[in-house]
Amino acid sequence: MDEKRPPRPPMQKGITCTDLGNGIYNFATPPVGFQQYLILGQEKALLIDSGMGIGSLRREIEKVTNLPIVLINTHGHPDHCGGNAEFAPALMCPAEFDVYEKMATLEYRQKDSGPKPGGPGGPGGHPGEGPKGGHPMEDHGKRPELQPTGPAPVPVEDGAQIDLGGRVVEVLYTPGHTHGSICIFDKLTGSLFVGDNVMGERVSVYEWNSGTIEDLHRSLLRMKALEPSKLYSGHRPNVLEPEILEREIRCADQLLNGAVGVPQKVRGGAMALAYEAEGVCICYDENKIR
């Protein structure tokens, strides 16, 4: 692990850092507390996602560690890789490259970072993120500056082992929320970083870049087989108990066996179907079952 450091100076407005223990840190970033994670090894630090790119995440990370930073993106949505420009090219599943190229640009983030009329919104269309009306990035009438468009990502393959020095993490291909979503498994602690495939409020499988319910079901079974000790999601509530996997698996299984959700307005006022069971909700496109 990294050596003991003096107390950290104050954080930038809107960015918080939480020490989760065992060399794992959580950074919540604007506009609505997107979740990034830092895993410290003896030689390197792995940063999982970079947020929307508001403010300088790197500046805050450097208050925690001076280790070289390796960045990996769980998927290509702008709220997960908008801050990539501050780091060396990120590792990413090749199936996400087209998503990243279209959605993580500065221009896209400037247009897309607020709630959309007619449905829950905020970047990525996640529920409960962004106030009703207005723009979650506005600060007294001014929008904060965003990081520029990041460099092209570097491919990472399913099963890749990333050695941080005395600590190895594994990359798992887990399509569902998007075609190329990945999870990161910390073998030292059993922690599983799940991106947006597992969420406390709602999992979305309705966008043009989403996989299918069948993809998600298969990925959830793979996650469960790891017997993780804790799950860390890309959105609040960000720390989840592994038992939520069982409930989400059953929810997806019911959809695969004919259950139908209720119509719901989503991103941009579009319509999707929302199916809830055992406190888990999957919001999906009827054409994305299999």
Regions found by a protein language model. Name each.
Residues 1-9, 123-127, 135, 221-230, ...:
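Accessory terminal helices/loops
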Residues 1-18, 138-142:
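Short, basic/low-complexity N-terminal boundary segments at the transition from targeting/disordered tails
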Residues 13-63, 184-195:
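Conserved beta-strand hairpin/beta-sheet module of binuclear metal-dependent hydrolase folds
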Residues 20-26, 159, 168-170:
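Short, hydrophobic/aromatic-rich segments at coil-to-beta transitions
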Residues 37-41, 133-139, 196-199:
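Short, basic/glycine-rich phosphate-binding loops at helix/coil junctions
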Residues 42, 65-68, 84-90, 187-189, ...:
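Short glycine/proline-enriched coil/turn segments at helix->beta-strand junctions
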Residues 45, 52-53, 145-147, 154, ...:
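Metallo-beta-lactamase
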Residues 54-163, 251-261:
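Active-site HxH/HxHxD metal-binding segment of metal-dependent hydrolases
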